[in-house]
Amino acid sequence: MMRFYRLILRISLSFFVLSGGGANADTMTASEFDAYTKGKTLFFGQTGKPYGAERYLENRRVQWSFLDGICKDGYWYEEAGEICFIYEGKNTPQCWTFEEGPSGLIARFSGDPQKVDLYEVQNSDQEMICLGPQVEV
């Protein structure tokens, strides 16, 4: 499975580089982002490695996982041209800008001084794996 993600990520990065690195891409509005994501599960990669997946539900609700079986429910909203997410257990918003590149979404975290982007590596209608709550014995 990891080989599949790596292959998809390499292909996506190749298209991104060949297209000029997204220099001409425009930041998505909230309505464009909603139209692109609603009802989908998107898998993201960063620097050649799988990063996480997010399921986009109705009413701007989301479910995020770092692909470790642990999923966090949350929601998103638009603020000052950015798409901001709040997840259960954290009240601090995580804000991003999104652009539609030749191979999918490109996400830039607004609080990242090194500006390392996330790239959509797979758009899927399939469910991501969310294990149940941890039970201590």
Give the positions of each predicted feature.
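Bacterial N-terminal signal peptides
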Residues: 10-19
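Bacterial N-terminal signal peptides that target proteins for export
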Residues: 2-11
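Lipid interaction determinants
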Residues: 21-73, 84-137
